[in-house]
Amino acid sequence: MIKFTNENLIRGIRMTISAKSRHLALGTDMTRKFSLSCRFLNKANLTEEEKELLNEPRARDYVDVCIVGGGPAGLATAIKLKQLDNSSGTGQLRVVVLEKSSVLGGQTVSGAILEPGVWKELFPDEKSDIGIPLPKELATLVTKEHLKFLKGKWAISVPEPSQMINKGRNYIVSLNQVVGYLGEKAEEVGVEVYPGIAVSDLIYDENNAVKGVITKDAGISKSGKPKETFERGMEFWARQTVLAEGCHGSLTKQALAKYDLRKGRQHQTYGLGIKEVWEVKPENFNKGFAAHTMGYPLTNDVYGGGFQYHFGDGLVTVGLVVGLDYKNPYVSPYKEFQKMKHHPYYSKVLEGGKCIAYAARALNEGGLQSVPKLNFPGGVLVGASAGFMNVPKIKGTHTAMKSGLLAAESIFESIKGLPVLEEVEDEDAKMAMFDKEATINLESYESAFKESSIYKELYEVRNIRPSFSGKLGGYGGMIYSGIDSLILKGKVPWTLKFDEKNDGEILEPASKYKPIEYPKPDGVISFDILTSVSRTGTYHDDDEPCHLRVPGQDMVKYAERSFPVWKGVESRFCPAGVYEFVKDEKSPVGTRLQINSQNCIHCKTCDIKAPRQDITWKVPEGGDGPKYTLT
């Protein structure tokens, strides 16, 4: 790995790792104590010394490619770039991956079932006796599968569309573990991988082209004052910036708006995936079994479905995906998931077992209609930042990685003839070189996507997800999807559209609905939300600025605007107990919003589902957030 010479960077990385390590070693209680740190954001009375410290020049580094996000797409991009560089270039390209989690994979959530094709493409020389170039302990071949419609206590078999067939083809994994392995492969080929580094902003030049990124300042108190641990964020200047943040990334959100990348496309629509990993009794374990379910517990007007995957040594992943375009503000995706586990189809597997992990994450469901323009001046979008998930397959890892390979090939062709950065020692000379070089706008990547297997795959299934949003709801969607998948294969002259309202705007007033009475958790099969959050390992320093923003951080005013209409929908769509409405006699509506930011597991649902689109998720300090395992 190439070493940085900048002392500020080295010191900052060490302090970030040290701070997070102290938390892990002490086993700090992170979820049972609600934090009030987001109630008010006080204006700090800064001294001149503190002002000078907060505004000191940032350390700067120059790289060829800066990749924000160390998930499957980001790491695939990085690995392919260095493979090309090592085989056909100088071998000296600086490819840097910045990941906000303290460890690679620590904030990765997926089902997951992998298709092996893209792995063989990325690692063509890797020998494997299991059919996919992964360590055999990380992958379990699907040997049996079911598709069921749940109704009452029944589980009714349903014909499987061809794109959903996994048996004998695909592999059950913990994507959390797989990403850790990918990180090792990236370092082997010379990628610089830096976990625990949060990226807060893009760098723009005078022509509004992206020239790199800025990492977040660390060690600032919730009042805005620098603490003893303060470290100024730094700048990474790059010839090409790759946004691989996953679904609904904060920098991606900036780029989409600034460059109008959704022009001529539909808005994105999302789902919320919630999952647990269980150790089950040997008699309930069926290694290689994968099942998907429709129907119960969701009503006809809510899109979604459940799954259970048996993998590894006695482990079962159980989960539910709920489409976030639901209209009823009383729906709680978390409680729907807990309810689902009591259906006999799931409970008979989980009884006598032990839940060992919990996770939740928003995912893209818009498909081809919602894929934005992929390139902008100085950068590109890859993976879930763009939204390549194949919804009928319930898979996005293979398309995310494939997009990374396409991006890497386009980037390499555009920069392979440029001066080698490592041969320019003077920092001023590097700056001058970057100023002179023309901005790279990779139209070739957009073109490559339209000719790729990703486009073909998404085109074929483009009408399936929006068919569930029609007047006939879930039943109509199932009928259309069956015809489209089994007979038409997407070869129709029309493309269905989603509702013009986004997932937040589509919420209807609570007055149109009755409150939903969910069963209380039994503590055996189903759990209260704080017990689940305690299984995520999430952590945020209580004394840091709140990363969840509402207008003016005015919790009373927020409640005035939201609570009378939607009756606390924020407390129901969040799968981590972050948002509460608590009594407040001074409030005109008798309540105020309370944000328990320490519980946040970075699922991004609040930034998507807030009905007035007035909750903004900002990146917290590097290393903060969940510390997932087996997810």
Curated annotation (Swiss-Prot):
Q: Which domain of life is it from?
A: Eukaryota
Q: What does this protein do?
A: Accepts electrons from ETF and reduces ubiquinone.
- Keyword check for Acetylation, yes or no: no
Query: Is the keyword Lipid biosynthesis in the record?
Result: no
Cofactor(s) for this protein? [4Fe-4S] cluster; FAD
EC nos: 1.5.5.1
- Note, other: Present with 3320 molecules/cell in log phase SD medium.
Q: Which family does it belong to?
A: Belongs to the ETF-QO/FixC family.
Q: Cite the binding residues for FAD.
A: 65-79
Looking at the record, the residues that make up the 4Fe-4S ferredoxin-type domain are 591-620
**Annotated protein name in UniProt:** Probable electron transfer flavoprotein-ubiquinone oxidoreductase, mitochondrial
Enzymatic reactions: a ubiquinone + reduced [electron-transfer flavoprotein] = a ubiquinol + oxidized [electron-transfer flavoprotein] + H(+)
Please give the chief subcellular localization of this protein: mitochondrion
Annotated localization: Mitochondrion inner membrane
**SUPFAM superfamilies hit by this protein:** 4Fe-4S ferredoxins (SSF54862), FAD-linked reductases, C-terminal domain (SSF54373), FAD/NAD(P)-binding domain (SSF51905)
Which organism encodes this protein? Saccharomyces cerevisiae (strain ATCC 204508 / S288c) (Baker's yeast)
The residues the entry assigns to the signal sequence are none
Q: Which UniProt keywords apply?
A: 4Fe-4S, Electron transport, FAD, Flavoprotein, Iron, Iron-sulfur, Membrane, Metal-binding, Mitochondrion, Mitochondrion inner membrane, Oxidoreductase, Transit peptide, Transport, Ubiquinone
One GO molecular-function entry: 4 iron, 4 sulfur cluster binding
Instruction: Give the binding site residues for [4Fe-4S] cluster.
Output: C574, C600, C603, C606
* Entries under InterPro entries matching the protein: 4Fe4S_Fe-S-bd (IPR017896), ETF-QO (IPR040156), ETF-QO/FixC_UQ-bd (IPR049398), ETF-QO/FixX_C (IPR007859), FAD/NAD-bd_sf (IPR036188)
Give the enzyme class: oxidoreductase
Which cellular component terms (GO) are annotated to the entry?
A: mitochondrial inner membrane; mitochondrion
Q: Which GO terms describe its biological process?
A: electron transport chain
Q: What happens biologically when this protein's gene is inactivated, per the record?
A: Displays higher growth rate and higher sensitivity to superoxide and heat stress, on nonfermentable carbon sources. Leads to decreased intracellular oxidation upon heat shock.
| Details of cofactor binding | Binds 1 [4Fe-4S] cluster.
